[in-house]
Regions:
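Helix-coil boundary/capping segments in enzymes
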Residues: 1-121
Length: 121
C-alpha cells in the first residue's frame, strides 16, 4: 500500500470575482483584480504565490506530489469591529466558499475555517 502525502495546513483564496460586492463596497474584504494583495479596510497583505488560488493550488500539489490538503480558507476574514449583519453575511459567504472548495475536489481538499465568536448567542 502506498503512503499518501498530505499537506496538513494550507490556504485557498477566492478569485476576486467570487467575493460579494458588498464586502468590497464596505471595505470588509477584497482581493485586487491582479491578485497581488488581499485587503480589509486600510490593512493589506501581499499574496505571495499564485498557488493560493484553487486551480493553481492543484498544479502546485501535483508539482510536489501532494495527494490531499487540509485547507484553512479565508483565514483573514476576522470580522473585527464589523456590524452584526455584515459579520453574519460574510461568514455565510465564507461557509459557502469552503463548501464549494470541498465540493469541487473532495478527493484533494478538506476545508475548514475559524468562526469568529463576537456575535454567537
Amino acid at each position: 500500500m502506498s503512503k499518501l502525502k498530505i499537506n496538513g495546513h494550507g490556504h485557498i483564496l477566492p478569485e476576486p470575482s467570487e467575493i460579494p460586492k458588498f464586502m468590497k463596497d464596505k471595505k470588509l474584504f477584497w482581493i485586487d483584480d491582479d491578485k497581488k494583495f488581499m485587503r480589509q479596510g486600510e490593512w493589506s497583505r501581499p499574496i505571495t504565490d499564485a498557488s493560493f488560488f484553487f486551480n493553481e493550488k492543484l498544479i502546485w500539489m501535483e508539482k510536489y506530489n501532494i495527494d490531499h490538503a487540509v485547507m484553512l480558507n479565508l483565514s483573514q476574514v476576522y470580522c473585527n469591529g464589523w456590524l452584526r449583519d455584515d459579520a453574519r453575511d460574510a461568514i455565510r459567504w465564507q461557509n459557502d466558499f469552503n463548501a464549494s472548495v470541498q465540493e469541487r475536489r473532495p478527493d484533494k481538499f478538506t476545508s475548514g475555517f475559524v468562526v469568529q465568536p463576537l456575535y454567537l448567542e
